[in-house]
Amino acid sequence: MKKFLMVMLSVVLALTTFVGCSNGGGGNTPAPSENTDNLSEVQKIIAEAETMTLEELAKKAIEESNGKTFYGVGNSSRGKSALPLFIEYLQSIDSSYKLDFEWQQPKNNKIFDQLTADGLKDVGTFAMTLIQDGNQIESKMVQTGVLDTFIPKEWAEANGTTPEAYEGYLPLQTLNKIFEYNCVNPDKTYDNCWDFVAEGEHGLFMDIDSEIVGKNFLYMLTKDEYAAYLKDAYDKLSAEEQAYFQPTVDAMAKDATELGLGENGKYALAWIKLWVNSYNAVTDDGPICNTLVDASAVDKFGLLVYSKVRSVEETDTVSVNNIKVAAYQPGYEGIGGYAYCHYLFVTDNSPLPWTACAFIAYMTETVDGFSAWGKDLGGYSSNPIVAKETEEKFHHSQGLSAKVACETTMDKGYDWWVGDGKLVVEDPKYCASVAFTVGSWIEMLDKYTPE
C-alpha cells in the first residue's frame, strides 16, 4: 500500500505542476491584452467578446447565425428550455431573426467522450456546452484544449471583477445535494453528520461511479477546511458514539499520513470509508426523493439534490412533510451536504462562437436567461444580481416555487448553505490534485451490497 501511494504521489506532483500552469483553472483563453498570435480563431473571438455588453454580443450573434442551426450539449436538459428564450431575446432586437436548435444530454458521463470526439474536427458540431464535474473538466477538457472559458463582461462586473482579472471557470449555477430523512417516526433523528455513517445506516445515494460529482464530494472531504468540519462534528458526539467510530478513525491515521493529508485527514478518511461501505446505490435522485416522502420509508435517509422536493405530489401516504432537511434542524452538527457547479464553455472549434458567447452571457446576466434553472429551489445563479432578482421573482425562501410551502421547501439560499449549512463545495483544482491518490484509495473500498 505504502509503495503504491508513493508512486501515485509522484505522479500527482508532476500533474499538479502541469495543472498549475493554467490561469487558476480558467481554461485556455488569455486576457484581451495578451499576445494573440498563438490563439485559435475561437479564442480570438472570445478575447474580443469579453470586452462587449450583452446587447453588443446579441448583434454579433444575429449576424452570425440567422437562419442556421445551433447545437449545444450539456449535463442539464434545461439548455433546451433556455434556448427558445434566447431566440426571443434576439428577435426583440431583429424580428427577422430565425434559429433552429438541438440540445443533447448524454447519459452515463458520456459527455466527455462526445466532446473529445467532436473536438477532433476542424469545425465542430457543438457550439458550446453546459457541463459538470470539475475534476474531469480540468484534466480532459481544459488542459487538452477542447473547451475555452468565456467570461462575460457584465457578469464579471456584477461580481466585482473583470474578465481579465477573473480566475477560474464560468459557473452558471451552484447546485446542492443535501441530507434529508424521513420523519414519520418522531423518535428517529439525525442531529450529526456522523449519524449517517453509524452502524446499520444505509443512506440512499447515487453511486459514485455513475455520477462522478459524488466522488468529487468525497475528494473534497479530505481538504483541510472540510476535514475540520468532520472533526468538529465528531467532537460533539457522545462518548458512546465516539467509541463506535474511534477504531475506524485510528485505523485511518496511517493512510492519511501516506496520502499527505492534514491533521484531521483521518476523520475524513474514516467518514468516507464508512459512507462507501454503507450507502445504498440508487440510479437517480428522483427515485430517492420518491422513496423518502412516502410514509412507509420509516427511518430512511438520503443524500440528494435539493430541488427534487419541489415536485412532490401529495397523496394520503406521500407528502413533502414526511421528510426533513437535516441541516435545517436546531442543533444539527457537521456537513449539510455538498455543492457542485454547472460550468459554461465555448468549444474551441465552435461553428457559431459569437452566438455561443451571446447565449452564455444571456444565461448568466439575465433573470429570463437563468429562469430555466432559477424557477426551482436549490440552484443558485453565480451572478449576485440575477440571484437576488430570481429570489424576488420566485420566492424560494418562502417555499412558493414548490407544490407545498413548508419548512423543507423554504430554501435558505446560497449564502446560508455555504455558511451555516456547511456545504462541501467542489473545487476542481483540488479534486484534480487528489484524484490519483485519494481517488485510488477510494477505489479499493468495499461498497455495500443489499441482501
Which stretches of residues belong to each language-model region?
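Positively charged n-region of N-terminal signal peptides that target proteins for export
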Residues: 1-4
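Conserved C-terminal helix/tail region of periplasmic/extracytoplasmic solute-binding proteins
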Residues: 41-50, 55, 406-451
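Mature extracytoplasmic/periplasmic domains
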Residues: 342-419
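Extracytoplasmic/periplasmic substrate-binding proteins
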Residues: 267, 277-349
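Extracytoplasmic ligand-binding site segments that recognize negatively charged/polar headgroups
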Residues: 68-88, 101-114, 124-287, 313
